[in-house]
């Protein structure tokens, strides 16, 4: 299980990302349109003024049971080994083990 502080940090990042979503979205659209170099520097300065943790690239998907940041299956929101255990004891309806 992941440390509680890491899970709390990830939740804080998620809240910041949601709070600054629209504020961050507008300047990035303006940057993609193109324009003069001075305008793009000005827009870049506005983006740099925002908190680092408000960037969506700093978020990680985590297993909602264990908090594990790696080997997540997006469809279930679980890490791979927890998903496998739950399928073995039939806690996930419709999921079957593969056999060939």
Curated annotation (Swiss-Prot):
GO molecular function, one term: rRNA binding
Location of the protein in the cell: Plastid, Chloroplast
Keyword Ribosomal protein found: yes
Cellular component annotations (GO), alphabetically ordered: chloroplast; small ribosomal subunit
Keywords, ordered alphabetically: Chloroplast, Plastid, Ribonucleoprotein, Ribosomal protein, RNA-binding, rRNA-binding
Keyword ATP-binding: no
UniProt main location, coarse: plastid
Gene Ontology annotations of biological process type: translation
UniProt cross-references to SUPFAM superfamilies, sorted A to Z: Glucocorticoid receptor-like (DNA-binding domain)
Pfam families listed in its UniProt record: Ribosomal_S14
Gene3D superfamilies for this protein: 1.10.287.1480
PANTHER family (UniProt xref): 30S RIBOSOMAL PROTEIN S14, SMALL RIBOSOMAL SUBUNIT PROTEIN US14M
Function: Binds 16S rRNA, required for the assembly of 30S particles.
Protein family per UniProt: Belongs to the universal ribosomal protein uS14 family.
Known partners and oligomeric status: Part of the 30S ribosomal subunit.
Protein name per UniProt: Small ribosomal subunit protein uS14c
């Amino acid at each position: 299980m992941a440390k509680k502080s890491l899970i709390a940090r990830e939740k804080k990042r998620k809240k910041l990302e949601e709070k600054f979503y629209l504020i961050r979205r507008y300047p990035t659209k303006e940057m993609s349109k193109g324009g003069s170099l001075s305008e793009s520097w000005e827009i870049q300065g506005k983006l740099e003024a925002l908190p680092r943790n408000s960037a969506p690239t700093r978020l990680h998907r985590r297993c909602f049971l264990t908090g594990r940041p790696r080997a997540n299956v997006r469809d279930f929101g679980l890490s791979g080994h927890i998903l496998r255990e739950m399928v073995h004891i039939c806690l996930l309806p419709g999921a079957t083990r593969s056999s060939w």
